[in-house]
């Protein structure tokens, strides 16, 4: 968990000097200033949801943040900014923040493991679709929400989960902002629950629940038991893959292969006419 925090902090600081990073911070400031939480790489302080928006965008914008491979979710870009903002707003210490973050990672990854890859198959970015639930859970834990309010916060997230993969067509910035928007939505949901708003209790498995909406009623291959299987004993947080290269994990094996060929066989790139890469069919659209 500490390694993931350090990884995200470093990436966010690197992003803060980029055009998209400056624009993300400016946007978060435009939405309202405050004293609750810090923006990484600046001296701005914002309401917690706005800080999560800025920091989540900084965390993901360079495509250098970690991935949980099987669930295909960029977990830490959602979890760490939400935990930082919620902990600051709730004046909690680092130990409490880490505990809440681990809870967020465990739930976030399991949401994707119910139907690995199937959000992407339907054009949804699993990171941003599942991310609000993790952020809401983190905030609920740090802000002292009892079970009923926590359930309401998660229920409210069912109406906040969103994220289109259309950015793959033209390289739009929407991918960069997805974890930030997820964090913002989750923290708002937790705050709504604290104010008495209610959310549907069967937000995941209900007839109009999360999985029926996003992978289709009766469609897809889903296993809802994976939401709780091994919870508290089998730590998905330990399965996060940190990136050696700032690009999609799907490309890393080919980069490794190219580097190996260069180092071991001294191949001159000018001698290469073409390269054939064999990939899983699910990776083709990406």
Where are these regions (language model features)?
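N-terminal core-entry segment
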Residues: 1-238, 281-283
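A conserved active-site cap/scaffold subdomain adjacent to cofactor or substrate pockets
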Residues: 230-276
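Transmembrane helical segments that form the transport core of multi-pass membrane transport proteins
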Residues: 274-286
């Amino acid at each position: 968990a500490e390694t993931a925090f350090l990884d995200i902090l470093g990436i966010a600081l690197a992003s803060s000097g980029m055009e998209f990073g400056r624009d993300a911070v400016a946007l978060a400031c435009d939405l309202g200033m405050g004293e609750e939480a810090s923006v990484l790489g600046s001296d701005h302080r914002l309401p917690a949801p706005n800080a999560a928006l800025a920091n989540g965008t900084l965390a993901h914008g360079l495509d250098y943040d970690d991935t949980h491979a099987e669930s295909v979710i960029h977990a830490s870009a959602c979890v760490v900014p939400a935990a930082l903002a919620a902990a600051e707003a709730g004046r909690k210490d680092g130990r409490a923040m880490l505990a809440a973050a681990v809870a967020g990672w465990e739930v976030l990854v399991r949401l994707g493991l119910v139907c690995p890859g199937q959000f992407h198959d339907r054009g949804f970015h699993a990171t941003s679709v599942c991310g609000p639930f993790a952020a809401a859970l983190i905030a609920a834990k740090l802000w002292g929400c009892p079970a009923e309010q926590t359930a309401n916060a998660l229920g409210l997230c069912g109406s906040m989960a969103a994220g289109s993969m259309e950015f793959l067509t033209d390289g739009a910035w929407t991918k960069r902002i997805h974890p930030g928007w997820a964090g913002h939505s989750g923290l708002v949901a937790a705050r709504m629950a604290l104010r008495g708003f209610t959310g549907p209790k069967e937000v995941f498995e209900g007839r109009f629940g999360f999985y029926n909406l996003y992978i289709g009623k009766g469609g897809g291959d889903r296993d809802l038991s994976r939401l709780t299987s091994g919870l508290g004993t089998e730590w998905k947080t330990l399965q996060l893959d940190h990136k050696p290269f700032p690009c999609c994990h799907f490309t890393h094996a080919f980069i490794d292969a190219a580097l190996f060929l260069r180092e071991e066989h001294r191949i001159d790139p000018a001698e290469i006419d073409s390269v054939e890469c064999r990939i899983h069919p699910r990776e083709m659209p990406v």
